[in-house]
């Protein structure tokens, strides 16, 4: 079982009241890998609740995958990693690396080693392939990052998780129509 992000700024206690009940209704008591694209509250606070309540909530997180950001001083990122390390195995991923889980292959497209001005532009971008299904997860990257990752995209995608919740500062027309095949 793999999750990518899990949080909300609109729903209070999203882990306890939305994510855990959803997982339990599907018979899921364990998340093998929780992939964190970046540490904004709307991407992690539900997963933090799951980790904190694993003894009483009944859902355990085995591993957390976070972007490898060397020399990164963002307080929320460092705090999240330090808290998670107490209970959970932390794995780091960087651009160009692959993970395989059975028939599922995930390639990390971003972040690379380039220094970014905008904190959201450090978001992990993942290409996931499962049989004929292909998905692109973009975190909260801005339109400035989109041209940097276009050459790494792997053919047509069945599904796109639009960058930054579809905000006007991301998901440029060129990104969607040129070469990526959405």
Can you name each region flagged by the protein language model?
Residues 1-182:
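Non-globular, low-confidence helical/coil segments that flank catalytic cores
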